Amino acid sequence: MLAPTLSYAATSCVWRSTNTPAPVYLVGTIHALSGKDYPLPKAYDQAIRDSKTVLFEQDPKPNPHYRALWERAAKYPNGEEIGRHLHAKTYKLMFAAIRQVSWDWNEIKYYRPWALAALGWGIRGYNDVRGSLGVDNHLEHLAKRFHKQMGGLESDAEHLEVMRGMPDIDAELMLVDSMVHGPKNKAQMEQVTAAWKRGDLGPPTAEVARSRQLNLGAEIRLLDYRNLRWAKRFEPRIKSGESIAVVAGSAHFVGPNNVRELLEKRGYKFEQL
């Protein structure tokens, strides 16, 4: 799908409220970047400096039990194997794909399809939230430096349930897309990242549309449901007059049922910086 040719006066994927007692920033990020993508546009620094509280997708406070929780969510119970949950064609495709990444079948046969996608190719905007060069990680360090209060939009359990509770058919589609289009998806994300750096919403919006057309069920779990829950969760802070920055993947601020539009429907107004 071609990205719409739109022009933007803005230079970042950051929005600031224009009709609230205290500033509210919506900070769209790319979870996985490289060192050459820095420094970031000034609006990212401004959003952290101007806010009393910075809310990330997950609480940045380390959870020593998170890996064990992930493993429990990622595997089928009672020793079930993935083969029982896949179409025969997908099963055959999977064996061809795992040979390319040199996996040991006995080590991965109990994982759910989405977990294999995450381990082998990555799930856009989900499993790389805490990437060392990601914007979220960078802004977390900035918030610590400025002594800001920090919190999470969802608990670790809620974050894991997004995937663990996904129906097999949606998880299988996610795995197939990762195996078949992995290299192409990487090239597309490079285009999305370049657009994100200059505040161009066209390619990020087109990428969300492509993903929804391919696997609507998964996208609704990854984006729509979480957007609705998050907006309801932090709106009381806005009403109380607290200055906040909401830091999340840029896909949460474009496309259907995005956080920004959910707030605009409730009367809040935002300008893109």
Whereabouts are the PLM-identified features?
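N-terminal signal peptide c-region/cleavage motif recognized by signal peptidases
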Residues: 4-5
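A cross-kingdom marker for long, charged
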Residues: 216-273
